[in-house]
């Protein structure tokens, strides 16, 4: 099985798309999105002929639905939700990694010393299929029985649900809700999926439909290049990256975003040659792990070469 390497072998299409495009986030705006907001703030998108419109999801299930309905051009998906969507016949393709490491975790009350302690307890989930993967993987990885956990739907309300003790734990991102919760309640536990048997993999991936990839390659190339430059700027100038996010959104506190960015920024390029790289070996390792009997999330093995196309990512060291 082969996969196109980032920056290699792409069919050349250097024409500017000269059009608007929508990009749907995976979650409420937070530090992991700073590069996207920086790209728009600095005009990296318009310089390449695309005007990006950033949209925030109203619910956890928005991304796949809106991509398939052609109501958004791009969407950030959890890599596991991409796998599930493809298994369900949705021909979506990951074209760029936003991070190179897992962000998934279970955040739990201070009394929960190990994920095994969540047996018989109420644990909040957003409703995304990938939440079940995270919950099963972490609890089973700690020697517990995931079927004994009482799941309850909380949407994107992990912070509130944990602070009010509505739940004993919740699936959430350690770099976002985890940072906020540990600052507000220092004893909170954070159980990361890669600490319980998971491999290193790009948690968040920029995705498009196969039709967009085939019909609008110039749009995909320009958007990926603009976002890549945005994240490169954030890595070199994190303070202004925070400002770009805060200037475009409401309800965020600078100190919280700065803490989140400090936590997540190493994940932007960890183990990669360039920002956004989709490494074939890493993707295959993730697919094999997910295909394991205890953590199966699809009914057949994922075709990595069809699910990802990394050739639009600018290579390291390009001007």
Where are the model-predicted features located?
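Short amphipathic alpha-helical segments at helix boundaries and their inter-helical linkers
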Residues: 71-76, 265-279, 311-319
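C-terminal motif of bacterial Sec signal peptides marking the signal peptidase cleavage site
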Residues: 4-7
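Pocket-lining segment of extracytoplasmic ligand-binding domains
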Residues: 80-81, 157-161, 165-251
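Short, glycine-/small- and polar/acidic-enriched structural segments
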Residues: 14-164, 168-175, 190-192, 200
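Secondary-structure end/capping motifs
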Residues: 214-295
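Conserved C-terminal helix/tail region of periplasmic/extracytoplasmic solute-binding proteins
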Residues: 284-319
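Bacterial signal peptide processing site
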Residues: 9-12
